[in-house]
Amino acid sequence: MEGGMAMWVYHSPIGDIFIKRLSDGRYGMIHNGTVWESCDSPQAEADNVYMHVTGCYDWDRLDGKIYDVPSDLSEWEVC
């Protein structure tokens, strides 16, 4: 991951999930070193994590089973 770029982290039950600005200007959802998807804004990416629609099976399968998922990017830790 390149330094100096905006990045957020959510310490989830499956491990850390990051939202990071990618080299193409989009924002990616990263877990275990894999970019699972990307969106035009970090808020849109945070919404996808909240809704469990990321393409990451380990995360998406927990839909309805976790009740403290950040509902807004402002609830993510800036790193």
Region spans (language model):
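Mixed-charge, Lys/Arg-enriched low-complexity segments
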Residues: E2, W36-C79
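Short, hydrophobic/aromatic-rich segments at coil-to-beta transitions
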Residues: E2-V9
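Short aromatic-glycine-(Arg/Gly/Cys) micro-motifs in beta-strand/loop hairpins
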Residues: H11-V35
